[in-house]
Amino acid sequence: MGRKKIQITRIMDERNRQVTFTKRKFGLMKKAYELSVLCDCEIALIIFNSTNKLFQYASTDMDKVLLKYTEYNEPHESRTNSDIVETLRKKGLNGCDSPDPDADDSVGHSPESEDKYRKINEDIDLMISRQRLCAVPPPNFEMPVSIPVSSHNSLVYSNPVSSLGNPNLLPLAHPSLQRNSMSPGVTHRPPSAGNTGGLMGGDLTSGAGTSAGNGYGNPRNSPGLLVSPGNLNKNMQAKSPPPMNLGMNNRKPDLRVLIPPGSKNTMPSVSEDVDLLLNQRINNSQSAQSLATPVVSVATPTLPGQGMGGYPSAISTTYGTEYSLSSADLSSLSGFNTASALHLGSVTGWQQQHLHSMPPSALSQLGDRTTTPSRYPQHTRHEAGRSPVDSLSSCSSSYDGSDREDHRNEFHSPIGLTRPSPDERESPSVKRMRLSEGWAT
């Protein structure tokens, strides 16, 4: 609360005049003290009030200062009230209306000075806030995410959809992102969780779309995914496997073989034969339709409530499109015998001719081989009146009538666990030759 301007005239009220004298006298002495200390000078004040009462102030000693004053004979500056009033008028201040800021130091600044300082502080705060806003860079929301893939021609697909993202980033377009295609001369192997051959890392903006089941980008998936053309829809799809009886309406079940990562070291010949079979599948394919059927993993049985029938193989939660193998393709895998007791076999037309010429003992041995492991004894017995050939060929028949339930319960033949005999352990070259002959017929 500042002081208002007062008119510099004589105060008529005795009480007010006395209070004003007391305050301003102390203020004058305070200014004299400050001046003497700051400028190293000697000051002497001699004041007589209206009642002729003496008040004096001396910076050092009054007698000494007065002695100097009496002995000083040189010209010097001497001021009176008229001189001060004239000086104030020249500076643009009216002597009668001057604010007299030095009159009372116990009171703060005047209202004008306080308003000026307040405005300056507000301007400084506004300037600092603007500088802080300009100094903060716009966030890009980039998340480096790496996904192991096995494709050799991996690419980074980024789609910055954030409004605060970097506007210089543009979505990367690639033909393989629109539709997954495989050239006949290129061999791709199904990806596994333990494969890190195609591991790439990159900073991708949020909303980087992955591929859905039909090969088109899906911008609502998790942000910053590194995808590859050959394996776009093998790693990011549905979170749980669908029921097995949904995709088996009046058509043959198309199954795909996903080799687990644990068996890659023990069965190198199976991987090579799968590559050869995939090449033959691509070269001789007449249908470009991509069927999103469940991927069946050839792995150790896990839970008895999952899987197909009595063989609870681990079903992958992805739906790839480029490695779909029909039952006719699985029939070509009948000669795959590995040291880890994995056997893929089914009976088709060209195998039935050999089965008819085989003795009954061999047929019974083949039937025993394609049944469920002894872990689930309720599925080990055959139905009355059904031969092992019928049980084996049931996977390639259409699901009609009551056979649909039987086939779902006894769906063993495409992927069965068996221990190969010594005469069946052949070299990879012999297996490859037999696959070529079987495919040609």
From Swiss-Prot:
Regions of compositional bias (Basic and acidic residues) in chain numbering: 401-411
Changes after translation: Phosphorylation on Ser-59 enhances DNA binding activity.
Residues within the DNA-binding region(s): 58-86
Keyword Transcription: yes
Residue ranges of domain MADS-box in the record: 1-61
GO terms of biological process kind: apoptotic process; B cell homeostasis; B cell proliferation; B cell receptor signaling pathway; blood vessel development; blood vessel remodeling; cardiac ventricle formation; cardiocyte differentiation
Residue positions where Phosphoserine is found in the record: 59, 98, 106, 110, 222, 228, 240, 387, 413
Role this protein plays: Transcription activator which binds specifically to the MEF2 element present in the regulatory regions of many muscle-specific genes. Controls cardiac morphogenesis and myogenesis, and is also involved in vascular development. Enhances transcriptional activation mediated by SOX18. Plays an essential role in hippocampal-dependent learning and memory by suppressing the number of excitatory synapses and thus regulating basal and evoked synaptic transmission. Crucial for normal neuronal development, distribution, and electrical activity in the neocortex.
Full protein name: Myocyte-specific enhancer factor 2C
